Amino acid sequence: MTTSSDNLFCPEQNFYGPASKKIYVDGSLYPLKVGMRKITLSKTYTLQESSFSELPMYDTSGPYSDPSAKIDLQKGLPCIRDTWQTQQKETRPSNQSSHKPLNGRTPIRAAEGGSVTQMHLARKGIVTPEMEYVAIRENQMLEEWIERFSIGGNTFSPVTAEFVRDEVARGRAIIPANINHPELEPMVIGKNFRVKINANIGNSALGSSIQEEVEKAVWACRWGADTVMDLSTGSNIHQTREWILRNAPVPIGTVPIYQALEKVGGVAEELTWEIYRDTLLEQAEQGVDYFTIHSGILKDFLPVAARRMTGIVSRGGSIIAKWCRAHKRENFLYTHFDEICEILRAYDIAISIGDALRPGSIADANDEAQFAELKTLGDLTLKAWEYDVQVMIEGPGHVPLNLVAENMTRQLEYCHEAPFYTLGPLVTDIGAGYDHINSAIGGTLLASLGCAMLCYVTPKEHLGLPGKEDVREGVIVHKLAAHAADLAKGNPTAWLHDNIMSTARYSFAWEDQFNLSLDPVKARKWRKESSPEQGENIEEERFCTMCGPDFCSMKKSQEATE
């Protein structure tokens, strides 16, 4: 294992302070360097006969938090996967488009008729570098703690590369990792792993620039986004995505129908399969790791959706619905699904099968249209698996709290345990300005029941294009939701994080509390603002301004036992 020096890179983004160091954990099967953060604690904490003077943390920031890294956004991040791609021998140069990557690499694809997907290799019994990488990440160097930990009579085992392989082979987990995204630090999405979160970014016809979107993508990674979706619908969609990909250490997803629509001047009726196919190939060669494709909305579902309070709220779904009505034909993303899968398996692109008929209001939740489409998504999942294509299923939406659990039950039944990826769900329709909290409430419950990844919502949801601070708020709130779900599922590393935080709080170890929080910047700032007279001596205070020195329950509790 190698460790970087002091965390000085990008001081304005030095979120975690000098107690946090970037470290790299070596692989045992492959020449891997798996990035994590290590927090040095102010004291040693003893929990279940294990002692901790430092805590390794799961880290999504890539090289951006490494002071030794030489970051040049013009050139992109280092191509770390080039040295360990097992699929290389099964590939050939790709000439499907005129795309020229910023990093100068020649795009590659599977040999004619071949497959290079993680599922294909997993089903052949091969443990790939990506599988070992994500196993190391999930364990956070805490294998000994995981084996000792028990709760409610349940015991646990560390994640192994073989376990990851088996989950991917079964379709219960995916590793989104296009062979043309060599800058990627692989991660896993599945109900038997840490709950992940996705951050949406992207320009619109009314705002933002390439620079702003790249900055938002990096910002989201720094705050903890496990994946990022570029949902650009404005100008320069292709160039924006290229800059994001070359500087992204996390998987990047897109909705290709947006760029296809741009090519026909925004006129949905003029879309064709050929235009869409060419768009898939362009994005595949760029390195997009997963596509949201709305193949499950069928023309027979449209009359049912028309009776809803809020109709079709999916942008991609509304585009396809308009095309189907105009041409009086079936959705071409459904009729050409086999051809789509052939493209996906050639580049190892996962498919997020889109829920075009997700409810956009609680009145429409769990209705006939939503569940009819969900059954179709299950059928498409089986078809994609015939091609060894990795699949996750998109979910709602707006769902009142009492109907949330049914979504998970039906998804597991209809979609054969493929990972569930949901936008919330939002549990009320009146949260404008606070819909990130609204989303996190439903997301926490759904993730505790088995949802694998939560798509964040920002405070600007339903109101406008989010800026950097909105991205930060959305990421932090959904990290909180994901972590709460991990606790409910008994995740040992999540419980350790909470238990050390609680012990630090009881012992008034303020710096440890800041460093262990999801937003150390805000925690440190608000604590110091509440006691400005203490200055740098805040560690000596055994109370906060909420209760003061005479009414602090923890202080009194300690005094009572002395």
Swiss-Prot record:
Reactions catalysed according to its record: 5-amino-1-(5-phospho-beta-D-ribosyl)imidazole + S-adenosyl-L-methionine = 4-amino-2-methyl-5-(phosphooxymethyl)pyrimidine + CO + 5'-deoxyadenosine + formate + L-methionine + 3 H(+)
Record carries keyword Transcription regulation: no
Q: InterPro entries attached here?
A: ThiC, ThiC-associated_dom, ThiC/Bza_core_dom, ThiC/BzaA/B
Q: Where in the sequence does UniProt note compositional bias of the Polar residues kind?
A: 85-100
- Residues binding substrate, per UniProt: N200, M229, Y258, H294, S314, R315, G316, D355, A356, L357, R358, E394, Y421
In the record, the note on similarity to other proteins reads: Belongs to the ThiC family.
What is this protein's record name?
Phosphomethylpyrimidine synthase
From the broadest rank down, the organism's phylogenetic lineage runs: Bacteria, Pseudomonadati, Chlorobiota, Chlorobiia, Chlorobiales
**Gene of origin?**
thiC
